[in-house]
Curated annotation (Swiss-Prot):
Tissue: Detected in muscle (at protein level).
GO molecular function, one term: serine-type peptidase activity
pH dependence: Optimum pH is 8.0. Active from pH 5.0 to 11.0.
Protein name per UniProt: Myofibril-bound serine protease
Family: Belongs to the peptidase S1 family.
Main location: cytoplasm
Role of this protein: Serine protease which degrades the myosin heavy chain but not actin or alpha-actinin. Selectively cleaves Arg-|-Xaa bonds.
Sequence ranges assigned to domain Peptidase S1 in this UniProt record: 1-10
Keyword Cytoplasm: yes
Dependence of activity on temperature: Optimum temperature is 55 degrees Celsius. Active from 30 to 65 degrees Celsius.
Enzyme Commission numbers on file: 3.4.21.-
GO cellular component: a single term: cytoplasm
Regulation: Inhibited by the serine protease inhibitors Pefabloc SC, STI, aprotinin, benzamidine, leupeptin and antipain, and by the cysteine proteinase inhibitors DTNB and pCMB.
Length: 10
């Protein structure tokens, strides 16, 4: 969990 794929769909 670092890229942000689990936070935002961008």
């Amino acid at each position: 969990i670092v890229g942000g794929a689990e936070c935002v769909p961008y």
